[in-house]
């Protein structure tokens, strides 16, 4: 199932939220009706919060069913809220505050529960990232861009990436993430940073409200969401 929506008129949902196979984090500005619809589509428990006193949740943190990486500028109150949410939902998730010069972990890491791709900008933290997310990784860029997280969206079945990703890079991504499908595409009527526009897991996807019909078909194909 795929749902189209906006967050207070904004269609870059992936910048402001995070969804995994088992949990989700959304900005405080999202109304309760939209929250419930997204939770139903993705079939996950979710909560609303800030990261580092910011609504840029998806840009600043990255996670999968095994772990969650947040920047060290995340406040103690925010960390406690995350811990409480995980405990209330019986989720065994490694939570790590990582100190790095570039704190946009969501923009620089693309992960699912099988593997992760780490931007060269975070290569020195490879071991920590692998340990927290409990996956093997590959370090590198694709489409000549270091922002491997914001330019891709991955589930345990498939992955959609920037349209300029070449064939060798597609094979590399597929091998690391161990998915059946890797496709090139866009969202929100031509936006190439698909990770900034889409939230997805194997059960469903939430896409920016500007996403066209043909783009939705490509998203469904790449993420194996076609019934």
UniProtKB/Swiss-Prot annotation:
Binds to the 50S ribosomal subunit and prevents its association with the 30S ribosomal subunit to form the 70S initiation complex. This is Translation initiation factor 6. GO terms for molecular function: ribosome binding; translation initiation factor activity. HAMAP family: eIF_6 (MF_00032). Belongs to the eIF-6 family. Gene3D superfamilies: L-arginine/glycine Amidinotransferase, Chain A. The lineage of its organism: Archaea, Methanobacteriati, Methanobacteriota, Methanomada group, Methanococci. Pfam families: eIF-6 (PF01912). The keyword Ribonucleoprotein does not apply. The keyword Disulfide bond does not apply. Coiled coil: none annotated. It comes from Methanococcus maripaludis (strain C5 / ATCC BAA-1333).
């Amino acid at each position: 199932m795929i749902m189209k929506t906006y967050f207070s008129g904004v269609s870059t949902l992936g910048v402001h939220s995070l969804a995994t196979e088992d949990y989700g984090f959304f900005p405080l500005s999202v109304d309760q009706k939209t929250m419930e619809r997204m939770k139903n589509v993705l079939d996950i428990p979710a909560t609303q919060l800030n990261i580092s006193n910011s609504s840029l949740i998806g840009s600043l943190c990255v996670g999968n069913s095994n772990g969650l990486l947040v920047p060290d500028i995340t406040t103690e109150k925010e960390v406690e809220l995350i811990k409480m949410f995980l405990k209330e939902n019986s989720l065994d998730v490694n939570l790590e505050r990582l100190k790095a010069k570039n704190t946009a972990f969501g923009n620089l890491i693309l992960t699912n529960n099988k593997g992760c791709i780490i931007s060269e900008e975070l290569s020195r933290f490879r071991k920590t990232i692998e340990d927290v997310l409990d996956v093997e990784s590959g370090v590198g860029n694709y489409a000549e861009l270091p922002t491997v997280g914001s330019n891709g969206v991955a589930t345990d079945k498939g992955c959609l990436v920037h349209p300029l990703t070449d064939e060798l890079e597609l094979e590399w991504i597929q091998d690391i993430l161990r998915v059946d499908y890797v496709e090139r595409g866009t969202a929100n009527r031509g936006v190439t940073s698909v990770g900034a526009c889409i939230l997805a897991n194997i059960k469903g996807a939430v896409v920016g409200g500007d996403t066209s019909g043909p783009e939705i078909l490509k998203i469904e194909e790449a993420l194996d969401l076609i019934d």
